[in-house]
Amino acid sequence: VKRARVVVVGSYNQDHVWSTDALPAPGATRSGRYGGGPGGKGFNQAVAAARAGAGTVFLCALGDDATAMQARALAAAEGIDLRDEVHAD
């Protein structure tokens, strides 16, 4: 059986999420929680294709910052090929 090959053109995004138990009243301050993680529709599709067993190439633009390094590490861990990424810095 031949392995399917998939090419995804899209973006890698870093999701940032802040949450609190209730909205603050005008002038009030509330504490909250911060969380985040990898995302972007293109990256999520590439992960899904790779996990389904397809040979997956993800075409995207990445820079040199910590988010880009995280994207490269996550893609490598998922078996996603980034060799044709566009360097954007």
How would you label these PLM feature ranges?
Residues V1-L59, A66-Q70, A76:
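Glycine-rich phosphate/adenosyl-contacting loop at the front of the ribokinase-like
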Residues L59-A61, E85:
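Structural motif
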Residues G63-D64, D89:
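Conserved beta-strand edge residues that scaffold enzyme active sites
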Residues L74-D89:
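A glycine-rich helix N-cap at a beta->alpha junction
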